[in-house]
From Swiss-Prot:
Bias (Acidic residues) ranges: 35-45, 132-142
Cross-referenced PROSITE patterns: PX (PS50195)
Domain BAR: 302-522
Native source species: Homo sapiens (Human)
UniProt protein name: Sorting nexin-1
Keyword Membrane carried by entry: yes
Keywords: Acetylation, Cell projection, Endosome, Golgi apparatus, Lipid-binding, Membrane, Phosphoprotein, Protein transport, Transport
Gene3D superfamilies listed in its UniProt record: Arfaptin homology (AH) domain/BAR domain, Phox-like domain
Length: 522
């Protein structure tokens, strides 16, 4: 019985007969007559492993290896007499060996490699998720959380006054202490929340939704002016903008889990946000840093290895320009619609005055009713102007700011790449310095040079990982942003078309009701 392989004779190294074969086939197989002086270090050692495995394998395992032989018939049970038995083990013995005592693992490995194509067996170690799968994962992100901002309230007098908003949250998520709660927040609190989130997440490639822009003129009117229609209109615009901003924050899976967001929604009192004023020291420092980043961005020329990022960045820049042009046109439309409403109101007053001075009763009544129709139409124009603003102009304004944040994510990826390249250049200089020390035979400084090389090798590896991670995050964030943008535009455009349809239907209804009065004029 062959248990090792070092003391086996030539006859023992021959493959054993399969069950069901006649003795003649065994004799035919033994006709090779190898020399007795063969050593175990020669090429025939490959049959040693095969012979031992075959003696200790069950017929089921041996049969599973036979389909490799292209000349076998009936699953390898009936062999042709003139075929050499070595062909049966030509492929199987390549994967089997007795170097390890864990023969069961070798058998499983052999069966796996035989059943899979070579390329598939190599690539089956760690499957990488595709970005289509990442997009499907984003579709599963559904959060049962709704925030609302209501009741803007002016607190204080003069230039020290501020406006507080009621932030109401409804949710069934276990992250929060209750299902419904409300807190009071001022505008600087919203700005402070953005600063905290941006500081933590923007450097990692996340798209942090921006808050609405400051309006120094609008807030000055609210602080020192009386409560008129312009102040109420400004507060309503800001309230709606803050609500959209906060809803985008809680819709983001990463932002929702941030403790600063939960604190903003739940905590009764927040510490005063500092550095949010435009003319403060922190505000001026931010403006200076933005200018510095813009200059450094112009000096960085990135060798893009992934064409996807280059194409997406061009799409984002072109889309931002188009949205700016469209936003300017929509703002003009809003102003014209408001002007039309004012002119319609003046027209209605003039018709009413003319109707009251008319002697013809039928004509006087018709003019008076026409004035009433024009007053109703003036209300329609005013409502439609508001719809133009809140459903179109504000949507475009939000996405102009969001696209700027998307560009910032690409810029952050570029900075990470530049840091990686700078580290590689520094590592190359350290290696050159080590080579000069070796050439100059200065062993006292050589160890320090080696330590610096090890340190920079570690930095290069870490920076490369950072670049790969931020590339993955930016790609995933852009895919999510495009989905949210499509859904957002669809909802707003549908609502806008519904308002236009309602306005036209009401307009036709008013004129149809007035037509009999016009025909009744004698």
């Amino acid at each position: 019985m062959a248990s090792g392989g070092g003391g086996c004779s030539a006859s023992e190294r021959l493959p054993p007969p399969f069950p069901g074969l006649e003795p003649e086939s065994e004799g035919a197989a033994g006709g090779s007559e190898p020399e007795a002086g063969d050593s175990d270090t020669e090429g025939e050692d490959i049959f040693t492993g095969a012979a031992v495995v075959s003696k200790h394998q069950s017929p089921k395992i041996t049969t599973s290896l036979l389909p490799i032989n292209n000349g076998s018939k009936e699953n390898g049970i009936h062999e042709e007499q003139d075929q050499e038995p070595q062909d049966l083990f030509a492929d199987a013995t390549v994967e089997l060996s007795l170097d390890s005592t864990q023969n069961n693992q070798k058998k499983v490995l052999a069966k796996t490699l035989i059943s899979l194509p070579p390329q598939e067996a190599t690539n089956s170690s760690k499957p990488q998720p595709t970005y289509e799968e990442l997009e499907e994962e984003e579709q599963e992100d559904q959060f049962d959380l709704t925030v609302g901002i209501t009741d803007p309230e002016k607190i204080g007098d003069g230039m020290n006054a501020y406006v507080a908003y009621k932030v109401t949250t409804q949710t069934s998520l276990p992250l929060f202490r209750s299902k419904q709660f409300a807190v009071k927040r001022r505008f600087s609190d919203f700005l402070g929340l953005y600063e905290k989130l941006s500081e933590k997440h923007s450097q990692n490639g996340f798209i942090v939704p921006p808050p609405p822009e400051k309006s120094l003129i609008g807030m000055t009117k609210v602080k020192v002016g009386k409560e008129d229609s312009s102040s109420a209109e400004f507060l309503e615009k800001r309230r709606a903008a803050l609500e959209r901003y906060l809803q985008r924050i809680v819709n983001h899976p990463t932002m929702l889990q941030d403790p600063d967001v939960r604190e903003f929604l739940e905590k009764e009192e927040l510490p005063r946000a500092v550095g949010t004023q435009t003319l403060s020291g922190a505000g001026l420092l931010k403006m200076f840093n933005k200018a510095t980043d813009a200059v450094s961005k112009m000096t960085i020329k990135m060798n893009e290895s992934d064409i996807w990022f280059e194409e997406k960045l061009q799409e984002v820049e072109c889309e931002e320009q188009r949205l700016r042009k469209l936003h300017a046109v929509v703002e003009t439309l809003v102003n014209h619609r408001k002007e039309l409403a004012l002119n319609t109101a003046q027209f209605a007053k003039s018709l009413a005055m003319l109707g009251s001075s008319e002697d013809n009763t039928a004509l006087s009544r018709a003019l008076s009713q026409l004035a009433e129709v024009e007053e109703k139409i003036e209300q329609l124009h005013q409502e439609q102007a508001n719809n133009d603003f809140f459903l179109l102009a504000e949507l475009l304004s939000d996405y102009i700011r969001l696209l700027a944040i998307v560009r910032a994510a690409f810029d952050q990826r570029m900075k990470t790449w530049q840091r990686w390249q700078d580290a590689q250049a520094t590592l190359q200089k350290k290696r050159e310095a080590e080579a000069r020390l070796l050439w100059a035979n200065k062993p006292d400084k050589l160890q320090q040079a080696k330590d610096e090389i090890l340190e920079w090798e570690s930095r290069v590896t870490q920076y490369e990982r950072d670049f790969e991670r931020i590339s993955t995050v930016v790609r995933k964030e852009v895919i999510r942003f495009e989905k949210e943008k499509s859904k957002d535009f669809k909802n707003h455009v549908i609502k806008y078309l519904e308002t236009l349809l309602y306005s036209q239907q009401q307009l036709a209804k008013y004129w149809e009701a007035f037509l009999p009065e016009a025909k009744a004029i004698s």
